[in-house]
């Protein structure tokens, strides 16, 4: 298996989260499986945020001029996502507005992904030594390996496919 840096690890998170939203929208509106998929997406978002907080943001602060500003902007976006997820926790798929709230969350997540992949990640790749990014990627993988030992679910299937391990 090819070892990747932290940026590639976080980009893989993005693809997994996008796939989960696609599955949510392809599942019939009245199907309670949508709630399970949303819970998985929320879990993936939480793991992604934890990896950013623990590994990415310290690297941004130390490697980039103005890194604190990047991190503050990311934290503000994360607070919006957290508030939206909390608003969905008490909803069921049968409640009016559930689908609209999920789509609003997806739009916010998509904006977060675009910002990271078009602004933050290229800047970090230029400003941070490759060996640092590799080391941080290894640390993220170690954390995730522990998490996956108990997780499973659709997100694990998507990760396996992205790693070349099978088809969805």
Language-model segments: residues:
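Small-residue-biased structural context
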Residues: 1-168
């Amino acid at each position: 298996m090819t070892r990747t840096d932290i940026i590639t690890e976080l980009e893989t998170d993005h693809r997994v989260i996008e796939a989960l939203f696609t599955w949510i929208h392809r599942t019939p509106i009245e199907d309670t499986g949508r709630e399970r998929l949303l819970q998985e997406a929320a879990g993936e978002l939480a793991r992604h945020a934890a990896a950013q907080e623990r590994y990415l943001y310290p690297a941004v602060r130390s490697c980039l001029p103005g890194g604190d500003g990047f991190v503050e902007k990311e934290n503000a976006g994360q607070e919006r996502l957290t508030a939206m997820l909390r608003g969905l926790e008490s909803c069921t798929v049968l409640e009016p507005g559930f689908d609209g709230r999920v789509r609003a969350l997806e739009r916010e997540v998509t904006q977060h992904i675009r910002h990271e992949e078009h602004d933050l990640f290229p800047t970090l790749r230029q400003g941070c030594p490759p060996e640092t990014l590799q080391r941080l990627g290894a640390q993220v993988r170690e954390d995730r390996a522990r998490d996956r030992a108990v997780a499973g679910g659709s997100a694990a299937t998507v990760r396996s496919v992205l790693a070349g391990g099978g088809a969805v």
